[in-house]
Amino acid sequence: MDIRQDYPLSKRNTFGIAARTDWWIDYTCDADIDRLVKDEFFQECRVQTIGEGSNLLFLANFHGILLHSEVKGITELHKDQDSILLRVGSGMVWDDFVAYAVENNYYGIENLSLIPGQVGASAVQNIGAYGVEVSQLIEAVHARHYRTGESRVFRNEDCRYAYRYSIFKEPDYAEWAIMYVDYRLRLRPSFSLEYKALAKVLEEERITPTLQSIRDTVIRIRNSKLPDPATIGNAGSFFVNPVVSAEKFNTLQTEYPSIPSYPQPDGSVKVPAGWLIEQCGYKGHRSGAVGVYEHQALVLVNYGGATGTQVGALAEEIIGNVRQKFGITLHPEVKYIL
């Protein structure tokens, strides 16, 4: 376990916000959690779990303890002719796990290449891209309650997965520190190529689908649309794509015939938040140190020196204008930390 006081966070969040935390703690194993459960000072402090800081926005310095996983390793639990079950440490970098799966010919997560963050965060956020959500592949999440010390295995159904949602986003489950995530990946060749943007590139460039070619293509597409946080601070997609009723969508389509849409199994329709934002004139918008990325309106950026409150203010301005123009309220995918 590594403990640091008055710790700078500019390199611990992809927005590059120059906040600080009173305490930063890296945990690596169950024994570290056991120690924290017995520590009186820790138990009296405000605690927030944090991954790679790729899906949050610090609005101020954090007064308390940020708890960060350094649990590493990949263990093979079971293997048959069709699939393999892997247990992965929550502190492993997500894209390193994707690369490992591709190198070993394990199918299922190649479409999720280059998504920033840790393995633990994948289970919290239910990350998704190019037609795949990680909840389709998660069997179980192993967690420790950092107040009581309780150990619990959350089966997939326990996590109540939905679009960009899991039970771990609820306040009642915020004090669970994720230790490991179990993924069942496929051993037989099988690809998810229903997503139009990905399928179009593969077809136009006559790329034969393989694990590596799909990973390479996804990485290329993402790099063309999203800025590198090392160069321009950002948290990727800032807003969740809204889901509206069929009736609401039909009304919108009458006024905006070119509006993109993704029909959902329950009859509702998902609308790209980036398109809504772009229609309000924000693509490429800049106000001082903050702005909207020129190649993807869903991405808010820190050009250097911006505060979290400045980014948050731009987000609220966008929310208000989208609501006024379309009657749709956008919700941040990024978590605000006060």
UniProtKB/Swiss-Prot annotation:
<keyword id="KW-0521">NADP</keyword>
<feature type="active site">
    <location>
        <position position="333"/>
    </location>
</feature>
<comment type="similarity">
    <text>Belongs to the MurB family.</text>
</comment>
<keyword id="KW-0285">Flavoprotein</keyword>
<dbReference type="GO" id="GO:0008360">
    <property type="term" value="P:regulation of cell shape"/>
</dbReference>
<dbReference type="InterPro" id="IPR036318">
    <property type="entry name" value="FAD-bd_PCMH-like_sf"/>
</dbReference>
<protein>
    <recommendedName>
        <fullName>UDP-N-acetylenolpyruvoylglucosamine reductase</fullName>
        <ecNumber>1.3.1.98</ecNumber>
    </recommendedName>
</protein>
<keyword id="KW-0131">Cell cycle</keyword>
<dbReference type="Pfam" id="PF01565">
    <property type="entry name" value="FAD_binding_4"/>
</dbReference>
<dbReference type="InterPro" id="IPR016166">
    <property type="entry name" value="FAD-bd_PCMH"/>
</dbReference>
<dbReference type="GO" id="GO:0071555">
    <property type="term" value="P:cell wall organization"/>
</dbReference>
<feature type="domain" description="FAD-binding PCMH-type">
    <location>
        <begin position="17"/>
        <end position="188"/>
    </location>
</feature>
<dbReference type="InterPro" id="IPR006094">
    <property type="entry name" value="Oxid_FAD_bind_N"/>
</dbReference>
<dbReference type="InterPro" id="IPR016167">
    <property type="entry name" value="FAD-bd_PCMH_sub1"/>
</dbReference>
<dbReference type="Pfam" id="PF02873">
    <property type="entry name" value="MurB_C"/>
</dbReference>
<keyword id="KW-0132">Cell division</keyword>
<keyword id="KW-0274">FAD</keyword>
<dbReference type="GO" id="GO:0008762">
    <property type="term" value="F:UDP-N-acetylmuramate dehydrogenase activity"/>
</dbReference>
<keyword id="KW-0573">Peptidoglycan synthesis</keyword>
<dbReference type="GO" id="GO:0071949">
    <property type="term" value="F:FAD binding"/>
</dbReference>
<dbReference type="InterPro" id="IPR016169">
    <property type="entry name" value="FAD-bd_PCMH_sub2"/>
</dbReference>
<keyword id="KW-0560">Oxidoreductase</keyword>
<comment type="pathway">
    <text>Cell wall biogenesis; peptidoglycan biosynthesis.</text>
</comment>
<dbReference type="GO" id="GO:0009252">
    <property type="term" value="P:peptidoglycan biosynthetic process"/>
</dbReference>
<dbReference type="InterPro" id="IPR011601">
    <property type="entry name" value="MurB_C"/>
</dbReference>
<dbReference type="InterPro" id="IPR036635">
    <property type="entry name" value="MurB_C_sf"/>
</dbReference>
<keyword id="KW-0963">Cytoplasm</keyword>
<feature type="active site" description="Proton donor">
    <location>
        <position position="237"/>
    </location>
</feature>
<comment type="function">
    <text>Cell wall formation.</text>
</comment>
<dbReference type="GO" id="GO:0005829">
    <property type="term" value="C:cytosol"/>
</dbReference>
<feature type="active site">
    <location>
        <position position="164"/>
    </location>
</feature>
<dbReference type="InterPro" id="IPR003170">
    <property type="entry name" value="MurB"/>
</dbReference>
<keyword id="KW-0961">Cell wall biogenesis/degradation</keyword>
<keyword id="KW-0133">Cell shape</keyword>
<dbReference type="GO" id="GO:0051301">
    <property type="term" value="P:cell division"/>
</dbReference>
